[in-house]
């Protein structure tokens, strides 16, 4: 493989942190997660797909670990992690995509029993999901209703443009003229998909030693419609 094929300058994937999250209208939510969590309390972080829920719950987990607290992270979109609900405990349990269990009778009972145990043990819980409406078990819906609700709003156009510019700077790639406007007009308008596009473009740009230009973005959107 030739040297020009290696993206030598590409930085490792960014670690989710509070300070590298483009908050936009969500500053109060981010502030609560970063500094306002109360020991033993429960929180439900809601929001549409692509609003940054996964980024923020990962940041919560990293932050609690940094503080020396006992924390466990469970990504329920991965079915293999569901058994962790039976084992989890400590100071904090952080759950991404909790609504992946919605409509699954066994999964809902597993979560309900875990929540009862965590309440008795005064374990703090931070959960993320689109909403709580997917759950059918009335007792579980009641339990989830005891969590403080935090809701993420989608970024507006100016905030998405700022995110694209900041991500490109982090990866040390040059944005071609008009590329931000092109991305906003052609790519899905959610933060997660836009970040994926910038990171894929940065990899290609650094590999091929070119700017992150409109033709490159057009190629990427053709590869990943």
Language-model regions, residue ranges each:
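Short conserved motifs of the RecA-like P-loop NTPase core
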Residues: 174-186
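The conserved phosphate-sensing helix
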Residues: 187-201
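Walker A/P-loop nucleotide-binding motif
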Residues: 40-57
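Dynamic helix-loop-helix/coil hinge segments at AAA+ ATPase domain boundaries and subdomain interfaces
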Residues: 6-28
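Short regulatory helix/loop adjacent to the ATP-binding pocket of P-loop NTPases
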Residues: 132-146
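Conserved nucleotide-sensing/catalytic segment adjacent to the nucleotide-binding pocket
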Residues: 84-128
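Phosphate-binding P-loop
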Residues: 24, 33-40
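Conserved AAA+ ATPase "SRH/arginine-finger" region at the nucleotide-binding site
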Residues: 136, 147-159
């Amino acid at each position: 493989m030739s040297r020009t094929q290696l993206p030598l300058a590409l930085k490792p994937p960014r670690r989710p942190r509070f300070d590298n999250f483009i908050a936009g209208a969500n500053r109060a939510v981010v502030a609560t997660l970063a500094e306002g969590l109360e020991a033993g309390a429960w929180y439900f972080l809601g929001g549409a797909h692509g609003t940054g829920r996964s980024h923020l719950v990962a940041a919560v987990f990293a932050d609690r670990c940094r503080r020396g607290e006992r924390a466990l992270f469970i990504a329920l979109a991965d079915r293999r992690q569901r058994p962790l609900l039976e084992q989890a405990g400590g100071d904090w349990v952080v759950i991404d995509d909790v609504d992946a269990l919605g409509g699954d009778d066994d999964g809902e009972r597993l979560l309900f029993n875990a929540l009862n145990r965590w309440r008795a043990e005064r374990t703090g819980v931070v959960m993320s999901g689109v909403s709580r409406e997917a759950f059918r078990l009335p007792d579980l819906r009641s339990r989830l209703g005891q969590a403080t609700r935090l809701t993420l709003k989608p970024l507006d156009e100016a905030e998405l443009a700022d995110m694209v510019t900041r991500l490109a700077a982090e990866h040390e790639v040059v944005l071609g003229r008009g590329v931000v406007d092109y991305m906003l007009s052609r790519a899905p308008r959610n933060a997660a998909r836009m970040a994926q596009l910038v990171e894929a473009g940065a990899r290609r740009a650094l590999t091929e030693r070119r700017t992150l230009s409109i033709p490159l973005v057009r190629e990427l959107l053709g590869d990943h419609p």
